[in-house]
C-alpha cells in the first residue's frame, strides 16, 4: 500500500466520519479515478504534436494514454471524422493515489504565482476539474525536450454526490484551496 493511501485510511477517513457522521464505512467519500485529458486542436495541421503529447502524458501518468479521435467532421475547423484531436488517460488505485500526491505536493506549488486553486470548479456531482496551463510543472517533463507548451485537464472523480463532502475530502487530502 502506498504511503498516501495509508495516510487516507489513517488520517482522512476518521476525520470525515467525525465531520459528517457516517455510520457505514461504505458511505465515506473516496477517490474513484483521476482522468488526465489533453485536447490538441492544433493536431489537425501537425500530426507530430499528438506523438509528443502522448509521450508527455505517459511520463506524467506512468500509463499509456489513449488517442481520442473526432466523432464528426466539422468543415469550419478543417476536421474530418476519425482524425486525432487529443489524448487521455484514466488512473485508478495505486497510480491514482501516487499521482494525486505528486500533483498536490510537487506540481501545484511549481505553478507561477500560485495562491491556491479555486473551490468553485465542482460539477454538482462531487467531481473536481482542474485546468493546468503548462505541462512543465510536472517533474518528469524536462523543459529542454519539449517542443511546445501544452495544457491539460485533470478531473478528480469522487464517490460522493455532494460538492461540500467532496471539497472536504480533497481539503483533508492536502488540496490547496483558496480561502
Swiss-Prot record:
**What PANTHER family does the entry give?**
60S RIBOSOMAL PROTEIN L11-RELATED
Q: How does it assemble?
A: Part of the 50S ribosomal subunit; part of the 5S rRNA/L5/L18/L25 subcomplex. Contacts the 5S rRNA and the P site tRNA. Forms a bridge to the 30S subunit in the 70S ribosome.
NCBIfam families tied to this protein: PRK00010.1
| Annotated keywords | Ribonucleoprotein, Ribosomal protein, RNA-binding, rRNA-binding, tRNA-binding
Q: Could you tell me which Gene3D superfamilies the record lists for this protein?
A: 3.30.1440.10
State the protein's purpose. This is one of the proteins that bind and probably mediate the attachment of the 5S RNA into the large ribosomal subunit, where it forms part of the central protuberance. In the 70S ribosome it contacts protein S13 of the 30S subunit (bridge B1b), connecting the 2 subunits; this bridge is implicated in subunit movement. Contacts the P site tRNA; the 5S rRNA and some of its associated proteins might help stabilize positioning of ribosome-bound tRNAs.
Name of this protein: Large ribosomal subunit protein uL5
Positions the record marks as coiled coil are none
| InterPro entries in alphabetical order | Ribosomal_uL5, Ribosomal_uL5_bac-type, Ribosomal_uL5_C, Ribosomal_uL5_dom_sf, Ribosomal_uL5_N
Segment forming the signal sequence: none
